[in-house]
């Protein structure tokens, strides 16, 4: 996928909010995702750590989105919200398997694979590099509103009105045409 064909990020259409810092031991900003975060390989949610968010933050949400998926609407790989404001880090695998690394009270919505939790990168062979946008949202309320059956679109709708700051990391992954 060439730069000219790249689709916008979902929060490009939201009101501007302050930024803060998100880092990861697994998601290299501007680099290539590790196999651990690929659906056909490890399929494991990455480590994420954040800081510098507003003091009035009441909770956090984390998403992983592929705007380049050939669906017309992108592809949501991970949606978790109601992460307590005291939590500033998710360990590797928090959104995978038994979700043992998620803090109490956090809610995982269904991803576009139809399951709750993290679903790794899986671009079609030969479709070029896809961006995987890991976003952490600082939220102005402890409970965002949706429950675990909320769709990514409904969670995103609620985030549109309750995000007070946002940070993201973007990595890419590509499957060659001959795979």
Swiss-Prot record:
SUPFAM superfamilies: PEBP-like. Transmembrane segments: none annotated. Residues 1-31 are annotated as: Disordered. Residues 1-14 have a biased composition (Basic and acidic residues). Disulfide bonds: none annotated. Belongs to the UPF0098 family. This is UPF0098 protein SCO1794. It comes from Streptomyces coelicolor (strain ATCC BAA-471 / A3(2) / M145). The lineage of its organism: Bacteria, Bacillati, Actinomycetota, Actinomycetes, Kitasatosporales.
């Amino acid at each position: 996928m060439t730069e000219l064909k790249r689709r916008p990020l979902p929060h490009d259409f939201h009101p501007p909010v302050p930024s803060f810092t998100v880092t990861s031991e697994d998601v290299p900003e501007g680099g290539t995702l590790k196999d651990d975060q690929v659906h056909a390989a490890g399929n494991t949610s990455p480590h994420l750590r954040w800081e510098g968010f507003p003091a009035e933050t009441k909770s956090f949400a984390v998403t992983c989105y592929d705007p380049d998926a050939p669906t017309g609407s992108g592809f949501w790989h991970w949606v978790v919200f109601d992460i307590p404001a005291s939590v500033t880090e998710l360990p590797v695998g928090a959104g995978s398997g038994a979700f043992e690394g998620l803090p109490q009270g956090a809610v995982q919505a269904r991803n576009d694979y139809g399951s709750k939790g993290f679903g790794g990168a899986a671009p079609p062979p030969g479709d070029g590099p896809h961006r995987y946008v890991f976003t952490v949202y600082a939220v102005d309320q402890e409970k965002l509103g949706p429950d675990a059956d909320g769709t990514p679109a409904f969670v995103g709708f609620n985030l549109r009105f309750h995000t007070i700051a946002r940070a993201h990391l973007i990595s890419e992954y590509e499957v060659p045409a001959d795979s």
